[in-house]
Amino acid sequence: MDLYNNKNSDTSKIKRDASVNDRIPDGLFLACPYCGAQMYNKQLGKYRVCAKCNYGFRLQAWERVELLTKNFEEMDSDIQMDHPEFPGYAEKLKRAQSQTELAESVLTGTADIEGEQVALGIMDSYFMMGSLGSMTGEKITRLFEYATAHTLPVVLFTASGGARMQEGIDSLMQMAKVSAAVAAHQEAKLLYLVVLTDPTTGGVTASFAMQGDVTLAEPHALVGFAGARVIESTIHEKLPKDFQRVETLLENGFVDQIVPRSELAQLIAKIVRLHTAEAE
């Protein structure tokens, strides 16, 4: 206390080291979007889950591949389209491609998951919010067509904000296009396994996200069609807290099982093996 009480003390000799950065780096601490718990970034671990509620933080497609398999062969990586003349659309696409190392909002290919060969699709919410564009629909359609031709099960991780508004009706048509490919795959008595991740909304929810033979989900993932605020403004009522969370969907029969991210690969392989044995 003498330092503060002594008016004659010389504090001018205390100098700040200019080489030291006293600013807290961005992203060092995070708040869980579901429970609000504050945590150190490294506490999330390799699976990127909240230690308190097990909510799975959003992953990029390539990050999820690393968690699922060591053997992945990408398909249609060079797919392109003539972009509609929507102001700024081409620039947004280029920026998203640079940030995610993807050509479109879905990564597709074949993979070995715990010894089981599957056709794998992973939507990426970091690519324009995982929006469903015409090339997204084309890639998913081709994935199902390939799987049908090669008698492979399809495993699709959904994550989307809905149809891509910049493409108008072309985007909306992808719902029907992918659904037709799903139907042909199921007609061949092949397995289609969906994993709902946060967020899965809009046209994706209204079509192929809800057409799987088995529907799994990550804890506390947001799944719905319209946003909660849109619904509330329409019906003029306050919605329940977990109205569009997968826990509510599970209670009402829309989801078969909620699975921690660390257990997904093993469970997917087990389901594929059971289906293969049944088919034989």
Swiss-Prot record:
Localization per record: Cytoplasm
Keyword entries, A-Z: ATP-binding, Cytoplasm, Fatty acid biosynthesis, Fatty acid metabolism, Lipid biosynthesis, Lipid metabolism, Metal-binding, Nucleotide-binding, Transferase, Zinc, Zinc-finger
Cofactor requirements of the protein: Zn(2+)
One Gene Ontology term of the molecular function aspect: zinc ion binding
A Gene Ontology biological process term: malonyl-CoA biosynthetic process
Residue intervals of every C4-type zinc finger in the record: 32-53
Protein name per Swiss-Prot or TrEMBL: Acetyl-coenzyme A carboxylase carboxyl transferase subunit beta
Lineage: Bacteria, Bacillati, Bacillota, Bacilli, Lactobacillales
